[in-house]
């Protein structure tokens, strides 16, 4: 997992509350456990007019040329609700998103996102409103998420955000559960070496 310190990129506004994980990655695409390849199915039922994914929906925001290459998803409250599928953050990351900004996230989704190196930023609802207004009036404007300073910046706007210090440490250093364990490999090995061989 790659560490995250700062990221600046185009923000795409998904102006919907309570976006659930079935909308993020529909159930028919969950057959595999490899994290790669889910991006093409992200928001499938909204992005495409057909089941095969061959006819893009021109009305859906991710299909609009002005948001091409967006790496920040701006969303509304309770993003990632519904079932706890880890495929949802996989799909968002595989599509190219580095960070998500919303006023709230579903708890399980929030943890899954962090565990997969995707940075979910919680701002006050009125701050999210201001970002939506900015992106609407200046399509293609870049937003900067600075995890080292716990700041979101865009144009003249600047907002602080809070994140659990342990989770922040993991994101800054690119550590998932395996990476954290490997940091203590020498200590674990020394402990195991002291144990009787018959245990």
From Swiss-Prot:
Keywords associated with the record: Amino-acid biosynthesis, Branched-chain amino acid biosynthesis, Leucine biosynthesis, Lyase
Catalysed reactions, semicolon-separated: (2R,3S)-3-isopropylmalate = (2S)-2-isopropylmalate
Signal peptide: none
Disulfide bonds: none
Matching InterPro entries: 3-IsopropMal_deHydase_ssu (IPR004431), Aconitase/3IPM_dehydase_swvl (IPR015928), AconitaseA/IPMdHydase_ssu_swvl (IPR000573), IPMI_Swivel (IPR033940), LeuD (IPR050075)
The keyword Lyase belongs to this UniProt entry's keyword annotation: yes
Gene Ontology molecular-function annotations: 3-isopropylmalate dehydratase activity
EC number: 4.2.1.33
UniProt GO BP: L-leucine biosynthetic process
Keyword Manganese assigned: no
Pfam families: Aconitase_C
Cellular component GO terms held in the UniProt record: 3-isopropylmalate dehydratase complex
Pathway named in the protein's UniProt entry: Amino-acid biosynthesis; L-leucine biosynthesis; L-leucine from 3-methyl-2-oxobutanoate: step 2/4
Protein family membership: Belongs to the LeuD family. LeuD type 1 subfamily.
Subunit field text: Heterodimer of LeuC and LeuD.
Cited function: Catalyzes the isomerization between 2-isopropylmalate and 3-isopropylmalate, via the formation of 2-isopropylmaleate.
PANTHER family given in the database record: 3-ISOPROPYLMALATE DEHYDRATASE SMALL SUBUNIT (PTHR43345:SF5), 3-ISOPROPYLMALATE DEHYDRATASE SMALL SUBUNIT 2-RELATED-RELATED (PTHR43345)
Protein name, entry field: 3-isopropylmalate dehydratase small subunit
Organism, as annotated: Aeromonas salmonicida (strain A449)
Lineage: Bacteria, Pseudomonadati, Pseudomonadota, Gammaproteobacteria, Aeromonadales
């Amino acid at each position: 997992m790659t560490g995250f310190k700062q990221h600046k990129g185009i923000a795409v506004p998904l102006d919907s509350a309570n976006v659930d994980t079935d909308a993020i990655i529909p159930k028919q695409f969950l057959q595999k456990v490899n994290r790669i390849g889910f991006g093409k199915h992200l928001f499938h039922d909204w992005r495409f007019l057909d089941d095969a994914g061959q006819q893009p929906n021109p009305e859906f925001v991710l299909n609009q040329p002005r948001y091409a290459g967006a790496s920040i998803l701006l969303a509304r409250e309770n993003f990632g609700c519904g079932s706890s599928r880890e495929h949802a953050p996989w799909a968002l990351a595989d599509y190219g998103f580095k960070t998500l900004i919303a006023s709230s996230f579903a708890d399980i989704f929030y943890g899954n996102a962090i565990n997969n190196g995707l940075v979910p930023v919680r701002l006050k609802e009125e701050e999210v409103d201001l970002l939506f207004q900015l992106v609407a009036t200046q399509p293609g404007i870049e937003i900067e998420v600075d995890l080292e300073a716990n700041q979101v910046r865009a144009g003249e706007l600047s907002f602080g955000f809070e994140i659990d210090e342990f989770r922040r440490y993991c994101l800054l250093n690119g550590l998932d559960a395996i990476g954290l364990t490997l940091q203590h490999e020498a200590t674990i090995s020394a402990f195991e070496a002291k144990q009787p061989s018959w245990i």
